[in-house]
Swiss-Prot record:
Organism: Bacillus cytotoxicus (strain DSM 22905 / CIP 110041 / 391-98 / NVH 391-98)
Keywords: FAD, Flavoprotein, Oxidoreductase, Tricarboxylic acid cycle
Protein name: Probable malate:quinone oxidoreductase
HAMAP family referenced in this protein's UniProt entry, alphabetically: MQO
Family: Belongs to the MQO family.
Cofactor list: FAD
Gene: mqo
EC number of this enzyme: 1.1.5.4
Amino acid sequence: MSNMQKKTDVILIGAGIMSATLGSLLKELAPEWEIKMFEKLEGAGEESSNEWNNAGTGHSALCELNYTSEKPDGSIDIKKALKINEQFQLSRQFWSYLVNSNLIRNPQKFIMPIPHMSLVQGEKNVTFLKKRFKALSNIPLFQGMEFSDDPEKLKEWMPLIMEGRTSNEPIAATKMESGTDVNFGALTRMLFEHLQNKNVELNYKHSVENIKRMKNGLWEVKVHDMNNGKIEYHTAKFVFIGAGGGSLPLLQKTGIPESKHIGGFPVSGLFMVCNNPKVIEKHHAKVYGKAKVGAPPMSVPHLDTRYIDNKKTLLFGPFAGFSPKFLKTGSNLDLLGSVKPNNVLTMLAAGVKEMALTKYLIQQVMLSNEKRIEELREFIPNAKGEDWDVVVAGQRVQVIKDTETGGKGTLQFGTEVVSAADGSIAALLGASPGASTAVNVMLEVLEKCFPQYMEKWEEKIKHMIPSYGISLVENPKLFQEIHTSTSKTLGLSKKEAVYS
């Protein structure tokens, strides 16, 4: 078997935004390293990164209310919002570096300026939004945020949402002009095209079957070439598993101690997409509501202007669903296959703890199209069923693990890196905020897995990402400079915005 092994420095598993970002960073920091990528599907960005499989929001906590929770004393906890905003600034800087270096072109193909708004109804929620606005609006990262509870002003901001609204219930919104819509599918394809130009070997229709540690410390990756049915063995010093929902089963195959006692719970998503151009033209924003009491964070409803295939469109959702598959193109045995002796108690504990989530998912699965339209009418009172079609979005595998605070079988709602103690292998697990924070997450992979190179790489990283290692909250002048320059490079300045 050893004579069939093909050696390389780095193996990337999965052709999504995470592998694309890590590959792009490594090619700038260590251009001499040999990199190979293996993807089961026919092209890049076909699963979770695909533009139809995620919300396409440049998550920076400008409008997502689940990133600012209310404390027991009634004050607003903004720590998570600041963290997510800072992380998105890192992504903007790296993308700008790639554009300025002519490594990728035409940023309008993957990022567009779009106002981000939060919308709430009811006195209690209006009070919450007002407090949130006060807590954030003085912070440089949220400069320019506007608040209004005046129905006339709200008609200017969101005419489609206010049209035909007869309720006397208090209503309020905040607005940030500096929001973005990101086509992560287009960006992923651009990055892999760039990596191909940098001699990264891209292998599509190649399914990774196994990953095991060899006696010499290298990792052996068993690959099924679906083009000809042959089995190949590739070895590398470092392996990154960026396979979306497929990451957990592959991580389990490595046998590393860090892969134990982790489970995954798949949640599928549906969106409603508008097919009426007249309705689409009446809305120009990403408007996020507030999750209903008892509903999980991934259930926050939003009405989004999106740019897909250079065309303006309008989506509403998400509606959650349940499928045992870990990937949209996965198997119905994925969930069952992920239950191992080392995580069965963790999974069972989560099952007992998360009865509310289970109930919510069952209710969502049972929703008829008419019921979905009723939920849509909370946003668009005049919505007509014939103007909207249902599209199935991607699968998200929420991480289940034992934590000190939550105890056994705690469901996680973030994105996290799991790596071997020696840094030779890393996997990305979890969901939101996901793709928006890809650069921050991949910098974390570099720090965890290549600590011996970080001193050497630091100067180059800071050249690409000027705020690396610096808090923008504490350096408002630097934030202003970075925000202005990235807006200009990415075509996000108001005067430069071009809409299709």
